[in-house]
Curated annotation (Swiss-Prot):
Protein name as it appears in the record: UPF0367 protein Tery_1229
NCBIfam families xrefs: PRK13683.1
UniProt record similarity statement: Belongs to the UPF0367 family.
InterPro entries given in the database record: UPF0367
Length: 88
């Protein structure tokens, strides 16, 4: 199972959706990145393959990041993967 996290400006928790295959995850990732690059304030609607009734709609001009991670039993630490900031 592959998780796609969408980081939205001024929102502390990312939106997450899951895809069953690497190809589907990569395709969804590319769709999100292309929507961000377009610069239009369009809405992208996404669904989750793990929880089919889960749907999200995101205004793409508010997205600040996107990442793909693979969830495996051996790598599960109880914490979601993410971006780290170190204060100096």
């Amino acid at each position: 199972m592959f998780t796609i996290d969408i980081i939205v400006k001024y929102t502390p928790v990312p939106f997450s959706i899951q895809r069953k295959s690497a190809e589907d995850a990569e395709s969804t990732y590319e769709q999100i990145v292309e929507s961000i690059r377009s610069g239009n304030p369009q809405i992208l609607e996404l669904t989750c393959e793990k929880i089919p009734e889960k749907k999200i709609a995101v205004v793409m001009s508010e997205v600040s990041g996107v990442q793909i991670s693979q969830k495996s039993g051996a790598a599960a630490t109880g914490r979601p993967p993410g971006f780290v900031t170190v204060a100096q």
